[in-house]
């Protein structure tokens, strides 16, 4: 379930007590084998029920399930670190050889793919495929690296017969958004979900009655709140200088899966 990733990406939604619990779990994950919910509640000055509710909010049945899962994740992470310490212990530096850089990049992309697939909602994807398959027109929006992902998806969709607009110019994106109609679909790609231009386009699309599908991170964001559907991507973007590469890898895996699903649906 990758609960450590869930905790990191849901931080902006935590209450004060939930943040205390999250900080404790991350700082003391190596000691969780000997920690009970009662001990934890006493140490943090909160109720046991708050800890149970926190675990359930993350998708676990209770604290015991969350604790055991975190212990397992920590152990697996330690094993990977010991086996591949050369390319996962730090970001790329100016002293790295090309071989080391290649290993770091590959590992980063592997982690982005593993985490994205592990947290993916495939039932939601099926609903999205059904919505897109009926759309008379599709607009794809994105900036920077996300725009490249959008352009790639637009070419794929056009090849199988969909009417698609994917413009790099933000003014054109805004104009197209304002011309969408009910039944049309806008696919907004933004890892942060907070790019002003993309959010404005999503607002315009919703106002026109179009369905907004966001390909974004798990973190709460204006785009995530605006979207009718979300396709979640995960990458260690705050930990690596090459973060946009892992983000793009995660986004491409989602758009490729969406494309293949649409091909099957035809």
Curated annotation (Swiss-Prot):
PROSITE patterns reported for this sequence: HTH_RPIR (PS51071), SIS (PS51464)
DNA bind region: 37-56
Record bears the keyword Transcription regulation: yes
Gene Ontology terms: biological process: carbohydrate derivative metabolic process; N-acetylmuramic acid catabolic process; negative regulation of DNA-templated transcription; regulation of carbohydrate catabolic process
Superkingdom assignment: Bacteria
Metabolic or biological pathway, per its Swiss-Prot or TrEMBL entry: Amino-sugar metabolism; N-acetylmuramate degradation [regulation]
Subunit structure: Homotetramer.
PANTHER family cross-referenced by the UniProt entry: GLUCOKINASE (PTHR30514), HTH-TYPE TRANSCRIPTIONAL REGULATOR MURR (PTHR30514:SF17)
The protein's name: HTH-type transcriptional regulator MurR
